[in-house]
């Protein structure tokens, strides 16, 4: 790998900035100052330092985000803020993208990565990766609805796979319910449409899980962090 490409991948700066940093003598390779951007290095063997700090190359990165409402699950959008706008410059420089989509008014767990193979595996219909949502509903969900979800709901354009519906709480006075829904698909507005089929309306929707990943309760809306080693290992094992 070229030295300048390595430095860009380590988020030291853009390619132009990296060339200037090399000229300034701020980069060393195996203890010697190096000014050539074209130098071929072995990222697994050579020790590269920037301002004395050892740099470690990461091919892939994995971030958990608590996506807020009002933000688009995309890398760019002409009208709305995207989830990438919530990242810092270093995280954005890794060229990550959201794995799947959450509607603009849905909040909760979102995985961002630059690992296309993992993203493809998690989104593949063949994998049946479960996703769990917590929904606040206008209307009273019933045991009959639980059975309807379990059979597979026939919508206009497709029939849903059997889904698990748990009724968390019911408030008869306010005509509200709180439910937990687990689905293996992720079609457009699916949970909202499934609830709508039962004659009720989702007024708030939060994703809690995706496969083995569970939303960190300590993450405020709009916050993100790297996956822990254990979280990543469990995720990789689950799609192996």
What would you call each of these model-derived segments?
Residues 1-240:
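Basic, flexible Lys/Arg- and Gly-enriched helix-loop patches that mediate nucleic-acid binding at interfaces
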